Every structure is written in C-alpha cells, then in structure tokens.
C-alpha cells in the first residue's frame, strides 16, 4: 500500500524513533479483509520536503498533493486486490491500528502492482510476465528459505501472496540508523529519509543488483517518467547503491569517492533514471584502487601479448574470437605504449625474441590467424604501431609477407623483397631491407621525396640518408670523375657496390626540378642539408655552394628574401658554377721548390748585433717575403709548372702512341681472325650445300629407276593382254 500523505497536518515531519506503530490493512473498495498482520517497526521515519535549492538547502514546507512527494506503501493484503483500490497516481492514506495482534511481522513493499499504473506500456507488461514466470519457477525449485540479505524491512514474509504468514519470534537487535540524501535531478525536488541498515538477501523483488520494478539494465528504456516517489514502488532503497563495506550510500552522492559507471544504473528504475553527480573529492583509497586497476590492466594486457606471441596460432585465434573488444583494444594500446616508450624497449625486445624462437610461423599457419592477431604479430616483429590502427587496411596475404620479411614493411612502398633481385651484401644480410625506401646505414625509412636529405647511388640505386652518410663518412671529397686530373669534389661512396657518385650534380638536379615548389621551412631544411654536405669540400664549386647555402639560410631565417627569390638565386648559382674553371691542387714539386728558395734567401741574410743591423735585417726579411710574391717568383712558378706540364704531356704522348700501336696490332690480329673465321664458315656452308645436292641427286636417280621398272612391267602386261585378245578373237571367228 502507498501512503498518500506522509506529513502531519501542521506541515512538520512526523518522526517516531522509539515508539512501535502498528500498521493495519488497507481498507479496499470491496471491503475484503482476508487476513491482518501486525508489524513491528523501529525508527522508520518518512520525511517529505520541498527543496528550493538543489545545493542542499531544505525547507519545512510541502504540498500534500504535489508531484514532489516520496511515498512508501506496504503490502498487507493480497497483491492482486491492491491494484483495484489504487487511484490514478497509485496512492492511498495509511491507517494505523492500535490493537493489532501481530507484533512480529513486517510488511513487504509491493513492487509489482504499481506497474499497472501505466497500462499502455506493452514492454513493461511483457517484462513483468517474464519475471513472474521466472519467480514461480524459482519458488518451485527452491523450497528452502533464501539467505537473509534483503533490503526489505525485517521479519517480512518471503512470499508476497501468502495469506497466512508464519509467526517468528521477536529478535532484539541493535540497529544503526543512517541518514541518506538524494540529489536526483530527475525528480522535481530533493528528498531525505531515515532508514535502517539491514542484512541483504538476494530477493528478486528487491535486489541490490536488479531493480525492483524493471529488470532491464538499460536506463531510459521505458517511455514514462515518474515524479517523486511514483515509479520507484515506494522503495527508499531503490534510490541507493552499495559501497565497498556493504553499507548503503546515496546513488548520486558526489562525495562518495567512487566514480559512476554503467553498472551503477542497474540500481535505479528505468522510469526514473538517475544522473551521476559531479565528483568533488577522491580519497586516497580510491586513488590506490585506480592505480591497482591500471596495474591489473597492464598485467592482463602484457599477458595477452605474451600468449599471442608464444602460443600456437590456432589456439590464440579461438581465444581472440571469444575475447571482449575492450580487452583486445587494451592490449593494443599497451603495445603502442611499448613501441613509443624507449624505457620499455626491453619488453618489446623480449616479445620479438619470443617470435624469433618459434619455428612454426610459416605462410600456411599465419594464414589461419585472425586479423587482430596478425596485426599484433606484425606490429611486434616490425616495431611499427601503425599496423594496430584500423585506418590502414592491408590484405592478410600482404601482412603475412611483411611478417616473413618477403615484402617491404613501408605501407607506402610494399615492394617484394629483395628489390630487383639485388644480391648485394646489404640486401642479403639484412632481412626485410628494401633498397627502394630504406637507408642502408640506419635501416629506417620515411616518406620524404624530391629532397636532398636522401642521396642515391648511380649504379645500384641504393638510397642513403644524407645525415647518415655524413656521420659514417660516406660523403667526403674524392677524385673528380669528370674534371681535370688531380681535382677533387664531394662524392657519395655507396656501401652496397662501392661506387662513387658526385654530389654537386645531384643537388643541382634536385633544386632545378623541385625548389620552386618548396615553402619557407622546406627550403631552409634543404639548404641546411646542402650546407652540411659541402662543409668539408676542397674544390672551388663545393666551397662556393657551401657559402651560398649558408648565406641563403641566414637571409631566409631573417626574412630578408622570399623563398622564390632564394630558389632562383640558387638555380642561377648552379648555372654560373658550370663556368667556374676547376683549378687543380698545387703540385708538390712546386711547393717544395718554393720552400727551398725561400730558405736559401733567408740563409743569405747575415745577422748583426747592432740595432741598425737588426732593423736592416727585418727590412730585408720583409722585402724577401714581399719578393716571394713578386713577378720573378711568379715567373719561376710558371716555368716550373710549364716544365711539369710538358713532362706530363710527353708522358701522355708516349702513352698515347703506345696505345695507338697496341690498337693497330689488335686491329690487324682481329682482321686476320675474322678472315679465317669467314673462310672457314664459307667452306662449311659450301660442303653442306654439296652434300644436300648429292642427296637430292640420289633421290632423283632412285625415283627414275623405279619409274623405268614400272614402265617395263606395264608394257609386258599390255603385250600379254593383246596376245590373249588376238587368240580369243581367232577362236570366236
């Protein structure tokens, strides 16, 4: 039964903590009193107040008919007859009986008949019928009394429909009264109530884990929103949820310290969904619990990854198919953290070692993997986390080939390995190395293109990071391949084929083709790379390019020049640099001769002890130093250079004549060999033709003989026939 008014006439709260009120049965419209139970109650107070402030302020004024009431009803009679006596709001006045003979019984709340207040809800009726059928089956199967863990008032009959309740002896217990508050935003006014804390029982009519009126855990499923106490079946405890120590706390209490979750909504009726309150403070125990939960998640994720990399493919595939999506996503997130965190590199290496130890990971077995399982295996082995994201879709067969190092792990390349069947030491010694997109020094790849930061070999097409080449001294001065003998230029020494590729022309081609499309930051990076490459250059072109790149970088950083103008200046410089003559290094002989002449001139100066002599000696020394740069010294240097070049020219002429003689000898020898081979070839062809003609002649002779023999035989046969014809004619005549 639901009390329609819970306040006294003067508007104040009716509160009795020490008295023992006795509740009588509800007087129904049919005036049927089957049985009456007297119930004992201690300290049950009903407070109905209106709140003008949601922040916790309460007033003593209330409206008896307002929708902000919290009403409680207790069942005394048959639950089937209760629905007929209820009004449209399901409320009746509670009457008290002073002379009831049953003091040891408490009335259990009616959690089912109130659902009849919305007869148009077919979904609610269907749920009620299903739950009632389940209750009947449970009662038939379980004849014993359930464990007393109920939220219902003490000493209540376990059956809602029992007409004769068995008396139980009164047990005097000291019960603690707890005050509970609610700031439920779905109700129109906050409420406050006093309730006892009783042991809980798994009673399906009032469960801590199930709502008493609706067994559907989804909040907001029903279409009717109940106000105040309506829709909660008069249950104060339906507004509460359990906490760790088994006590009762407000469901929306902001200082409870426990964050709301989807599981908490199962304690609220679907007609009156509760919003979780804002958390104000979090206790130290809660922080410890959160930390422990995070540690447990990490341990569980690590265990999942270890099972994936160590256990058989088929068993893990079955496990993953039955695994929750949250667990699998947590394992992937843990693996992403392993890849991103350098301090956790050892754990990632251990997982990779587990994979390397396995011998059953073939193409056939890996084809039986689940997609998520194969993604994790590939991500662990390659150390790349983008295989774990669902944005990149790679076919299963390509993932298997990437795992087995048969295909490039760069998703922008994915070339079959080795590229172009390369057999160099880099491609053969490094599994999974792709010469199209990976650096042979650091074995890494990136998506950079049309840039000077990647340097390529002219022969084997291996590409290397310019920074790696400078660090490993692969980009250094070398003898020029196109210029004069004795000149040097910056070269890239390929470690794959040991070929030398010149850098000046490569940088020029890149700037001419791509510089106009670069922005400010890109142009600064490219010029900085060029500056680093040509920093140790010895030739005039390289030094000039280094200075020009340094100048352009400073101007671009200070925004003295636009990127387009800077790129035009660099391109003009490359065109101008082609006309710069390559000056060879000064010959060692010339340097030695100059040093010797200077020492002789210096030795010819006689020292003097007087000041004048010293001044003269200093002046003479200065004159000697200046005379080294005079015209005579330049003439001597030029003469020495002329003699040196003449000597080299004579040597070159002699060498050229020797090469010419060798060529003539080789030519004569080749002509003789050619003539002999041609004659031999002609003789063989003639003999072959003669042999073919003889065979044809023999065939003709044989055919002629056969024809002659056949002709003679036919003539003989014809002559015999004529003779017989003549004889026959004579006989007839």
Swiss-Prot record:
Disruption phenotype: No visible phenotype under normal growth conditions, but the double mutants tta1 and tta2 exhibit a rootless phenotype and seedling lethality. No visible phenotype under normal growth conditions, but the double mutants obe3-2 and obe4-2 exhibit broad growth defects and developmental arrest of seedlings.
Gene Ontology molecular functions: zinc ion binding
Chain intervals with Basic and acidic residues compositional bias: 1-15
One cellular component (GO) term of this entry: nucleus
Keyword Transcription: yes
Bias (Polar residues): 21-30
Region of interest: Disordered: 1-42, 118-142, 592-614
Coiled coil start-end: 120-153, 644-733
Zinc finger (PHD-type): 436-500
CDD domains from the UniProt entry: PHD_OBE1_like (cd15612)
Keyword Mitochondrion applies: no
One GO process term, biological-process aspect: embryonic pattern specification
Subcellular location: Nucleus
Alphabetical keyword list: Coiled coil, Metal-binding, Nucleus, Transcription, Transcription regulation, Zinc, Zinc-finger
Functional summary from the UniProt entry: Probable transcription factor that functions redundantly with OBE4 in specification of the hypophysis and establishment of the embryonic root. Involved in the activation of ARF5/MP-dependent gene expression during embryonic root meristem initiation. Involved in shoot meristem homeostasis.
Quaternary context: Self-interacts. Interacts with OBE1 and OBE2. Interacts with OBE4.
Protein name: Protein OBERON 3
Taxonomic source organism: Arabidopsis thaliana (Mouse-ear cress)
Record lineage: Eukaryota, Viridiplantae, Streptophyta, Embryophyta, Tracheophyta
């Amino acid at each position: 039964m639901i009390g329609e008014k819970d306040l006294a006439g003067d508007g104040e709260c009716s509160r009795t903590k020490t008295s023992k009120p006795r509740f009588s049965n509800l007087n129904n419209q049919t005036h049927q009193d089957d049985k009456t139970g007297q119930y004992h109650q201690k300290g049950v107070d009903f407070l109905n107040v209106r709140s003008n402030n949601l922040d916790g302020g309460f007033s003593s004024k209330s409206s008896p008919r307002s929708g902000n009431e919290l009403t409680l009803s207790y069942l005394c009679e048959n639950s089937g007859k209760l629905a007929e006596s209820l009004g449209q709001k399901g409320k009746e006045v509670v009457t008290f009986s002073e002379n009831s003979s049953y003091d040891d019984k408490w009335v259990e709340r009616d959690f089912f008949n109130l659902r009849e207040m919305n007869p148009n809800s077919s979904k609610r009726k269907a749920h009620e019928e299903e739950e009632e059928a389940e209750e009947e089956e449970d009662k038939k199967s379980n004849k014993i009394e359930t464990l007393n863990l109920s939220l219902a008032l003490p000493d209540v009959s376990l059956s809602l429909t029992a007409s004769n309740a068995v008396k139980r002896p009164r047990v005097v217990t000291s019960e603690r009264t707890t005050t509970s508050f609610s700031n439920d935003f779905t109700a129109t006014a906050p409420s406050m109530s006093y309730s006892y804390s009783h042991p809980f029982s798994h009673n399906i009519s009032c469960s801590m884990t199930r709502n008493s009126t609706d067994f559907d855990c989804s909040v907001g499923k029903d279409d009717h929103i109940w106000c105040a106490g309506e829709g909660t079946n008069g249950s104060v405890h339906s507004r509460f949820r359990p906490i760790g120590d088994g006590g009762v706390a407000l469901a929306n209490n902001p200082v409870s310290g426990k964050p709301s979750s989807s599981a908490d909504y199962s304690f609220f009726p679907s007609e009156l969904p509760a919003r979780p309150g804002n958390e104000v403070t979090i206790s130290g125990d809660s922080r410890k619990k959160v930390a422990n939960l995070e540690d447990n998640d990490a341990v569980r994720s690590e265990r999942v990854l270890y099972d994936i990399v160590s256990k058989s493919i088929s068993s893990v595939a079955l496990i993953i198919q039955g695994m929750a999506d949250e667990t699998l996503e947590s394992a992937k997130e843990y693996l992403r953290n392993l890849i991103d965190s350098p301090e956790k590199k050892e754990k990632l290496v251990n997982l990779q070692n587990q994979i390397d130890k396995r011998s059953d990971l073939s193409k056939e077995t890996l084809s039986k993997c689940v997609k998520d399982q194969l993604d994790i295996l590939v991500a662990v082995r390659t150390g790349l986390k983008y295989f774990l994201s669902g944005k990149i879709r790679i076919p299963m067969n390509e993932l298997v080939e990437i795992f087995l190092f048969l295909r490039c792990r760069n998703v922008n390349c994915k070339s079959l390995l080795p590229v172009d069947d390369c057999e160099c030491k880099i491609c053969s010694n490094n599994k999974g190395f792709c010469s199209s997109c990976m650096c042979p020094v650091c074995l890494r790849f990136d998506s950079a293109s049309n840039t000077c930061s990647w340097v390529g070999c002219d022969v084997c097409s291996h590409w290397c990071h310019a920074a790696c080449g400078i660090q490993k001294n692969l980009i250094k001065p070398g003898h020029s391949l196109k210029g004069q003998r004795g000149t040097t230029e910056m070269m890239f020494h390929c470690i794959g084929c040991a070929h030398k590729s010149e850098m000046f022309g490569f940088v020029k081609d890149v700037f001419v083709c791509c510089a106009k499309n670069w922005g400010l930051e890109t142009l600064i990076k490219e010029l900085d790379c060029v500056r680093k490459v040509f920093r140790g250059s010895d030739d005039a072109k390289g030094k000039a390019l280094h200075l020009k790149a340094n100048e352009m970088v400073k101007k671009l950083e200070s925004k003295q020049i636009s990127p387009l103008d800077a790129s035009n200046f660099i391109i003009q410089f490359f065109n101008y640099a082609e006309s710069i003559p390559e000056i060879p290094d000064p010959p060692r002989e010339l340097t030695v001769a100059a040093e010797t002449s200077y020492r002789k001139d210096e030795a010819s100066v006689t020292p003097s002890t007087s000041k004048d002599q010293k001044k003269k000696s200093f002046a003479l020394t200065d004159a000697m130093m200046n005379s080294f740069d005079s015209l005579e010294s330049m003439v001597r240097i030029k003469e020495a250079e002329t003699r040196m070049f003449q000597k080299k020219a004579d040597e070159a002429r002699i060498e050229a004549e020797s090469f010419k003689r060798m060529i003539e000898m080789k030519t004569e020898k080749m002509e003789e060999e050619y003539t002999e081979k041609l004659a031999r070839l002609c003789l063989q062809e003639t003999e072959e033709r003669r042999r073919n003609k003889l065979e044809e002649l023999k065939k003709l002779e044989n055919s002629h003989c056969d024809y002659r023999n056949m002709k003679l035989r036919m003539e003989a046969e014809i002559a015999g026939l004529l003779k017989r014809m003549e004889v026959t004619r004579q006989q007839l005549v």
